[in-house]
């Protein structure tokens, strides 16, 4: 029997995916609505609230997939909400900055 794949949109590019028995968080933007400045400084971001409670986002994760390190894909609050030893998959050019944020299991 095939395992069901689930993809849940949390906000912006942030997704929680269940695939092959693993829980994957993609592009974690976890800051509160309107608490950050947009990349161009034009407006406050994120523009909408998270679609699920933080504990449902962070609990039981197996890994994080960061497509690229822009504020709308990875914000400063991520290091407050995720376990420091979680597997963090990212681009080679972003590995050092993720490690500097305290994450200890970063691969590219």
Where are these regions (language model features)?
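Metallo-beta-lactamase
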Residues: 2-4, 90-108
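A short helix->loop->beta-strand "cap" motif at the edges of active sites that frequently abuts
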Residues: 22, 84-87, 103-104
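Active-site environment of divalent metal-dependent phosphoester hydrolases
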Residues: 13, 31-33, 69-74, 95-98
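Short gly/ser/thr-rich secondary-structure transition/capping motifs
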Residues: 5-9, 44-51, 69-70
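Active-site beta-strand termini and strand-to-loop segments that position acidic
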Residues: 17-20
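Short active-site oxyanion
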Residues: 4-6, 82-88
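A short beta-strand/loop micro-motif in the catalytic core of glycosyltransferases
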Residues: 65, 87-90
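Pre-active-site segment of Zn-dependent metallo-hydrolases
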Residues: 22-65, 76-81
């Amino acid at each position: 029997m095939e395992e069901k794949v689930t993809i849940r949109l949390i906000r912006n590019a942030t997704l929680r995916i269940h695939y092959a028995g693993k829980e994957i968080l993609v592009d974690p933007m976890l800051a509160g609505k309107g608490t950050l400045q947009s990349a161009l400084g034009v407006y406050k971001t994120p523009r909408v609230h998270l679609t699920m409670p933080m504990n449902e986002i962070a609990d039981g994760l197996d890994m994080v997939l960061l497509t690229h390190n822009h504020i709308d894909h990875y914000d400063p609050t991520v290091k407050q909400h995720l376990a420091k030893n979680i597997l963090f998959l990212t681009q080679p050019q972003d590995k050092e900055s993720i490690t500097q944020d305290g994450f200890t299991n970063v691969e590219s």
